[in-house]
Amino acid sequence: MNNNIINLIAAIILSLSIIFGWQYFVVKPEQKKQQQQIAVQKAENLKKQQLKALVEPATGIVVQEESQVQRIKIESESLTGSISLKGLRFDDLILKKYKQDLSKNSPEVRLFSPANTENAYFAEVGLVSNLSSVKLPNNDTIWNSDSEILSPEKPVHLFWVNEDGVKFLVTITVDENYLFTIEQTIVNNSDKELPVQSYGLINRKYIAVEKAVNILHQGPIGCIDENLKEYSYDDIKDKKSEKFAASKVDWIGITDKYWLSSLIPDKSSNYSSNFNYALKQGTERYQVDFISPVQIIKPGENFSIKSRIFAGAKKVDLLDKYEKQYDIKLFDRAIDFGWFYIITKPVFYAMNFFYGYVGNFGVSILIVTVIIKLLMFTLANKSYRSMKKMKNLQPEIDRIKNLYSDDKARLNQEIMALYKKEKVNPVAGCLPILVQIPVFFSIYKVLYVTIEMRQAPFYGWIKDLSASDPTTIFNLFGLLPFSPPSFLMIGAWPILMAITMFLQQKMSPEPADPMQAQVMKFMPLIFLFMFSSFPVGLLIYWSWNNILSIIQQYYINKFN
């Protein structure tokens, strides 16, 4: 039955490889298209008329002309940038706490850029009407402001009055992080009823700089009717538009690996929302937007509605805070924690907790690995004992196989009777591997998708735990003046992982079958090349886990 154990282990390893291959190379199934049968055609036509121009790239606009438009400066601990008073558009935003790369003079990460720039990306909220006679603020409106600077300590109040005397007031606040709150108020001083709808949109010119991988979602995203909706850029490009009619919209936005721009509408109403793609004059634009039902404002009445814009880094604790504070459903799922969300997030919490004490995520990984190892010690102990018993039973198993080679039913019956007599579980040796698979994936996800791990250093030459080991043995770890091709980037940590894996195998019971024993000996070498490009933080975890397993195996061999 030793053959069965080895086959099971090999199957697990193969499954691990297939899962990673699937994550990287197989496009996820097309999501089930939402049925839109209750949309009001009038509202849809209105939205197309009012928002169509916002999807199209700006034409005939000169940068110098844009620079002459007055702006409100944004200044906080986390953000710098400005809001255009023309159209009240959030189109200039820089994240002060994050650099684009690790170089000394690296610029800060820019999130939003004006519509006439190469990387156009902006957000806005406003009002539209189904009556052309109603004069509302639009993209050409120049707003009046009581301040030139928006900060957490100082909100900005804006106003505009149309020719009928209707006053439009907007108050914008920003917190110390990445959340803007926009309150719009209409004071109907006219003698007519005003039908209005509030809307919000995020528009982006997107050019892929690297091949998309299925292990990470990037593109339109949102929580609609308490369900997470994710569409890649390619999905929306193929569909042209994905519509959701009269829904509860907690938030919609566009997500990158580490950054998120999101609209959070007022909870007083349901909204129609869309994920759109448009190609105009060779420029690809993606847009997410929402629009409310018609609200009738009678003469002499006021109407107010509040919306929020999140634009910044996807910090776990920050998204959790906003989700709880403003009841924003599934807001933390903007971070793609993946299949093992129920494990991945607690693993991150554990790492972040110890980081608060040791100040280094690499050390935090070592501590969490020790805790996981202690939790599984009893299971691993039983596993090693079972493997040893299986090795001792191998001669008797071979005898039974020879005796009943022509009768498979009797063969299986006799082998199971032997296991029962000797009190051996043939799959017990594989249980620790099965348990560690979701833990492995969870740690990988934490390293790959969380902003906290981005550019997080360890010691020595490791400056970014989320990136692969930058060294390689093929240029003697930097001593020789050339850079090998990417498939030969076999760094120090991948080598250490392979060595510790080899030593762990040496201390474990060897398969009785010589051929299988030879195959298992090649596994460290296979894994060396297979995982050399993975985040070095994962290799630190794996190497340290192997070292702890060696210590554990030594303890079991000595005292049992």
Swiss-Prot record:
An example Gene Ontology biological process: protein transport
A molecular function (GO) term: membrane insertase activity
Signal peptide: none
Protein purpose: Required for the insertion and/or proper folding and/or complex formation of integral membrane proteins into the membrane. Involved in integration of membrane proteins that insert both dependently and independently of the Sec translocase complex, as well as at least some lipoproteins. Aids folding of multispanning membrane proteins.
Quaternary context: Interacts with the Sec translocase complex via SecD. Specifically interacts with transmembrane segments of nascent integral membrane proteins during membrane integration.
HAMAP family given in the database record: YidC_type1
Family: Belongs to the OXA1/ALB3/YidC family. Type 1 subfamily.
Protein name as it appears in the record: Membrane protein insertase YidC
Organism of provenance: Rickettsia conorii (strain ATCC VR-613 / Malish 7)
Lineage: Bacteria, Pseudomonadati, Pseudomonadota, Alphaproteobacteria, Rickettsiales
